[in-house]
Structures are given as structure tokens and as C-alpha cells.
Regions:
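Long, contiguous, compositionally biased segments that the model treats as domain-scale units
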Residues: 1-145
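Polar low-complexity intrinsically disordered regions
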Residues: 1, 347-351, 460
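Active-site-facing alpha/beta catalytic cores
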Residues: 81-82, 86-330, 375, 400-401, ...
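Anionic group-transfer/hydrolysis microenvironments
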Residues: 78, 118-120, 299, 359-361, ...
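A generic secondary-structure signal
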Residues: 63, 102-105, 285-286, 312-313, ...
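Non-transmembrane, aqueous-exposed alpha-helical and coiled segments at domain scale
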Residues: 316, 322-326, 331-356, 362-411
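Generic low-polarity alpha-helical segments
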Residues: 287, 352-354, 358, 460
Length: 460
């Protein structure tokens, strides 16, 4: 379908209640000191071209519908908080390359397609637990879209325009990598083979890597030119971020003139975080009114009743692929809390009415004795195992994983095959907010999840 956009959606009379959120509690919004500057920026953003197109969002929803039916697996990954300074060619290439490497391993393990969604091209805002930092008395850093990590941290609405521009540049580069041969299956597999050769625990993953190599060799022996096959030469790659800054999201919302639906065209998929998912709040109201695929994060304090109410609010028509529920329980709580949530939602809404996805990062954060916020790889993997165990016990589909990662060999998360310790963190601790898995740890996670997917397939 050809979609025609209404360019006046951000400035003209509102339809379908797109501004109803303005009368609701809006958590985690910056205290913009210059309201006139904010109004001017919002006007500018309402007039610029959208970052993505409705038909792309619709296609992602179709792909996610297969995930909901158990026919695909969802991989979401990228920075905790993107920064303007790190938005470089090599930085973007590294994250995309890592996602592609993980996806190849997961595809083979699951024997189903992997839907690849970057936590990229818009993740420039972060919720914080307090407006001021206790240690410095400065305003909290709320992401590059709001204020600078260095300096006096005064929220500056002009940074929203920079966030838009950086997101556009990232999307442009992601689209190029998806089709220029960078995603060629043989090349990605060779990167993974190098990881297996160099990893201290590479012998554990050698069998899976060898099996993939044999499959590729079989295809070549059959006369199939992998480099010329669209399915193995290019990929579909989508962008997602937390819909946190409401003025930004509203300004980039457009109406599809063809069908009349509103789309949040700041990204293909947007989600509402644990701190802003109040059922009667502004964030849930706004995303409930757009046609994109959307997500909602659920922490360990979520009740089954709340989870169901959120699902009914965000996806009342039960559109396949519409809603992804991203659990972030923590390794110590996932086996206790998640089963009743899944059981209640599936019973009341029917099987496959939502996608169940695991964020094993946010519930496993702690501070080391030397003052670094970190996560241990063992805790991350334990939450993923718990997630799979819950779904195996209920007969439901473990639909995906949502991981904070980078393509660089940073030292931010403990453990893994590299056996990083607290003393190692000082080496390359580069995150602007929360700790990320490095390239090696990300691939290790992918190999381990692939083993879980294989086991789930055998036991199905």
C-alpha cells in the first residue's frame, strides 16, 4: 500500500485524541527553562520529514505477527543511551555488525527467521531516578536529546533537533548496511568463526559454528550463489527506542492520509518503559493511539492484572504483532513473577496475543565496590534461562531478547568468557548511562540462547 502522509498532523487540529496526553500525568519530562525555545523546536520537528515511513512500520508489524505465532524470534539490541559524539561510522557499523552476527547464530539455533530491531536511531533520552545527582548537585543527565553529560546540564530544547538529525544519519547508514553486502551471510558467518577461534570458551560454540559452515557449504554445492541471493545478501533491519520525550514523539507523529491512522514516525517500534507505564499516564495514552508496533516494559512489581490492563489499553483489537511485552524482572525474580503474568494474559486474551520478550539487563544492575555501575554476565544469562524455563513450563513461545550492547570491546559488564572483573572495568568503561555487553559477550549470549532455542524446538 502507498501511504500518503499528512504533513500538518503536528500543527493542525488534533484528531483521535492525539493530544489527550497533555491533560494526564507525564512522568520523566525535562524541566525546560525556555518554553518559547521549546515551542519553536516542536514546530520545526512537526514540519520536517518523518524518520521512517508507515509502510515500514506495517511491514515490521507483519514480521512481529510471525513472532507472536511462534514462527520467528525477535532480537532487539543497541546502546543504553546513544550519544551524539559516539554516532560515528564505526560506532554504527559495530552495533549493526554485532546484531547481524547474533542473528545468524539465533536463526540457525531456532530454525526460524530472526526479526532484527536495533535499539538505535533515537535512543537519546533516559529516565532518571532523581532530578538532581546526589553526588554533584547537578541536574541529572537525561540523555543527549535533553542535556550534556558534561557542563551544567541545563536542558536545551535545541538538542531535540540534533537528536532528530543524528537519528536520520543513523537510519541512513543502517539502511545502506542492510543492502550493500555488509549483511552477506557468508561474511557474517566468517566474523562469527573468528569469534569462536579467539574466544577463551570458543570450543563450546565450535559445534554450532561448524554446523552453520556445513549448511553454507551444502548450499554452495547445490549451485546456490549466496552472494547473489536476496535473502542471504541483504537483511531487514528496523529501528526502535523508548518513547520518553512526549513533545518530540508528538511532533513526529503523522497521519497516513490513505488509511487515516496515526504513526509515531520517529522509529519503527517505540516502547514505554517501566518508569512511565502508568495506565492512566501520558505515555501509555499517546502510544495507544499510534499504529506502530509498540512495546511495554514490565518490572518485578507488575501484577498479572496490571499486565492485562496494559495489554488491553495498548492493543484492544488484538492486532497480531502489535504489542511486545518486555519483561525485566531480574535473575532472582523472573521465575517467581513472570509465570502468573503470562498465564493470566494468555488466558484472558488468547494464545499469541502478545509477544513475550526478555530484557535481562535492567533487573541485574548493581554497583561495584570501586563505584562502577555494572551487570554480571552470569546474572544476565540466568534471567534468560529463567525466561525460557517459564515459557517451557507454560507451553508458550519465548519470543525474543532485548539487550543493551555495543560493537566495541568495552569493559562494562562483568564475567563472560573474558572473565572481566571489577578491576577490569576501568579499562574501557565508556557508557553514558548503563553498562552494555561488548561484542564478545553479545555473541556469547547469542550462542547460549541458540542452544536454548534448539532445546525448545526439540522438546516442543
Amino acid at each position: 500500500m502507498t501511504h500518503l502522509l499528512d504533513p500538518t498532523a503536528g500543527t493542525g487540529p488534533t484528531r483521535d485524541g492525539l493530544d489527550a496526553w497533555r491533560d494526564l500525568p507525564a512522568a520523566q519530562q525535562p524541566s525546560w527553562p525556555d518554553q518559547q525555545a521549546l515551542r519553536e523546536v516542536v514546530q520545526t520537528l512537526a514540519e520536517v520529514p518523518p524518520l521512517v515511513q508507515p509502510h515500514e512500520c506495517d511491514l515490521l508489524r507483519e514480521r512481529l505477527a510471525r513472532v507472536a505465532r511462534g514462527e520467528s524470534f525477535l532480537l532487539m539490541g543497541g546502546d543504553c543511551a546513544e550519544t551524539f559524539d559516539a554516532n560515528t561510522t564505526e560506532g554504527i557499523r559495530g552495533k549493526v555488525r554485532t546484531l547481524l552476527q547474533m542473528a545468524v547464530v539465533l536463526t540457525y539455533g531456532a530454525s526460524v527467521p530472526v526479526v532484527k530491531v536495533g535499539r538505535m536511531a533515537g535512543q537519546y533520552a533516559k529516565p532518571r531516578s532523581a532530578d538532581l545527582e546526589a553526588a554533584t548537585g547537578l541536574p541529572s543527565y537525561r540523555g543527549d536529546a535533553v542535556n550534556e553529560l558534561d557542563g551544567d546540564r541545563t536542558p536545551d530544547p535545541k538538542r531535540l533537533v540534533r537528536a532528530y538529525a543524528n537519528s536520520a544519519a543513523t537510519l541512513n547508514f543502517m539502511r545502506a548496511m542492510a543492502t550493500d553486502g555488509s549483511a552477506d551471510l557468508s561474511s557474517v558467518h566468517e566474523w562469527n568463526t573468528e569469534f569462536v577461534r579467539s574466544s577463551p570458551l570458543g570450543h563450546r560454540y565450535e559445534e554450532l559454528a561448524t554446523s552453520i559452515e556445513r549448511a553454507l557449504a551444502f548450499m554452495r554445492a547445490c549451485g546456490l550463489d549466496i552472494a547473489e541471493m536476496p535473502a542471504t545478501h541483504g537483511v531487514e533491519l528496523y529501528a526502535s527506542h523508548e518513547a520518553l520525550l512526549l513533545e518530540y514523539e508528538r511532533a513526529l507523529t503523522r497521519y497516513d492520509r490513505t488509511g487515516g491512522a496515526a504513526y509515531a514516525l520517529s522509529g519503527h517500534l517505540v516502547w514505554v518503559g517501566e518508569r512511565t507505564r502508568d495506565l492512566g499516564g501520558a505515555h501509555i495514552d499517546l502510544v495507544s493511539r499510534v499504529a506502530n508496533p509498540i512495546g511495554v516494559k514490565l518490572g518485578p512489581g507488575t501484577t498479572p492484572e496490571t499486565a492485562l490492563a496494559l495489554a488491553e489499553k495498548l492493543d484492544p483489537d488484538r492486532v497480531p504483532g502489535r504489542l511486545t511485552v518486555i519483561s525485566r524482572m531480574g535473575a532472582g525474580r523472573v521465575r517467581e513473577v513472570l509465570p502468573e503474568i503470562v498465564r493470566h494474559v494468555e488466558r484472558e486474551r488468547g494464545p499469541g496475543s502478545v509477544i513475550w520478550c526478555c530484557d535481562p539487563m535492567h533487573g541485574n544492575t548493581h554497583e561495584t565496590a570501586n563505584g562502577y555501575k555494572t551487570r554480571h554476565f552470569d546474572d544476565v544469562m540466568d534471567e534468560v534461562r529463567g525466561f525460557f524455563e517459564v515459557h517451557a513450563s507454560l507451553g508458550t513461545h519465548p519470543g525474543g531478547v532485548h539487550v543493551e550492547l555495543t560493537g566495541d570491546e568495552v569493559t562494562e559488564c562483568l564475567g563472560g568468557a573474558q572473565q572481566l572483573t571489577a578491576e577490569d572495568l576501568v579499562g574501557r568503561y565508556e557508557t553514558a548511562c548503563d553498562p552494555r555487553l561488548n561484542n564478545g559477550q553479545s555473541l556469547e549470549l547469542a550462542f547460549l540462547v541458540a542452544e536454548m532455542l534448539q532445546a525448545a524446538r526439540v522438546n516442543r
